[in-house]
Amino acid sequence: MAQGWAGFSEEELRRLKQTKDPFEPQRRLPGKKSRQQLQRERALQEQSQKFGLQDGSTSLPPEQLLSAPKQRFNTQRPYSSPPTPLTLTSPVGDGKPQGTESQQKELGLKNSHEVHKNAEVLPLKADCQLEKKKVELQEKSRWEVLQQEQRLMEEKNKRKKALLAKAIAERSKRTQAETMKLKRIQKELQALDDMVSADIGILRNRIDQASLDYSYARKRFDRAEAEYVTAKLELQRKTELKEQLTEHLCTIIQQNELRKAKKLEELMQQLDVHADEETLELKVEVERLLCEQEAEARKQVVHLERSFQPSGESVTLELAKENKKPQDQAASPKVDEQGKNSNSIALLDPERPNQEVETAVKDISASLIT
């Protein structure tokens, strides 16, 4: 109804002016709408058609709609003339009632008032409806834009939340896997450390024990080495002393034999006894035997020295030393006694020089062997 109405025509306005009540104050009629208002109304109508509005109805719930402003209509009644009696008697004496004319005038005035009121109320209602539609369309367009933006934001937020939840789940799984891997590696390293620490402890204990044994053995070796050196020096001295004594013995025997030979020659010259070849050969043989026995005695002495050398232990060295001392002490008086006996025998019995020499050599060799 509001879409087809475009305002009053000029004839209607003229007729309304003519039928206007003179007693009612003049009201300002709405003028023609400008081009901008018409374009705005058309845009609002197109927008309402686009959003599916029909006859001002909206798709929003009633609690979301804005309340329309209440229009105040001017319902003042025109000043009416005081009531007059319906029947008036004219002063003229014809006696006809004059109330019909006044009634007709009142009816005409009432009709004109009603027409004027209807003409004023119609454009006011149309303007109110247009304003309501404009406000509703504006509110609806804003509300729908806000709703669309809100929906888009909600969808974006949902997607972001889903992505965040997915990323958090992946990160949590990854961190759990990494923590499990790190724990496993830590356990393996701890096991290796425990094994290595146990092995190291055992080896350290063994090394300590071995170092103690080594120090004890080193001390023993140092003592044995010192004893060996001292024993070797002592042996060298004893060996030199023995060699000197044997050489002295040999020289004594040789000189004794020379004295015996000279003595025998003197005796033979005094007795005028000539030595034959047999005696000379016997003398040569005796000298050879003496030399051989002397060489054998020396060899035996060397062999005994080698047999009495230390084998690395101090006990054997001490025993050898203890055994050598009485032997040397016993051998030296025996040799002296044998030399003395041989000299005395040779002097007493000069006829048996060979037997005395042989016995002396045998005694000396026996003493050296023992």
UniProtKB/Swiss-Prot annotation:
> Positions of the region Necessary for interaction with RCHY1?
185-370
Q: Could you tell me where this protein is found in the cell?
A: Cytoplasm; Golgi apparatus
Write out the GO biological process terms.
Answer: non-motile cilium assembly
Annotated keywords: Coiled coil, Cytoplasm, Golgi apparatus
Q: Where is this region: Disordered?
A: 1-106, 320-370
Which InterPro entries would you find in this protein's record?
Answer: GORAB (IPR007033)
Gene Ontology cellular component?
Golgi apparatus
Q: What is its main location?
A: cytoplasm
Family indicated by similarity: Belongs to the GORAB family.
Q: What name does UniProt use for this protein?
A: RAB6-interacting golgin
Originating species: Bos taurus (Bovine)
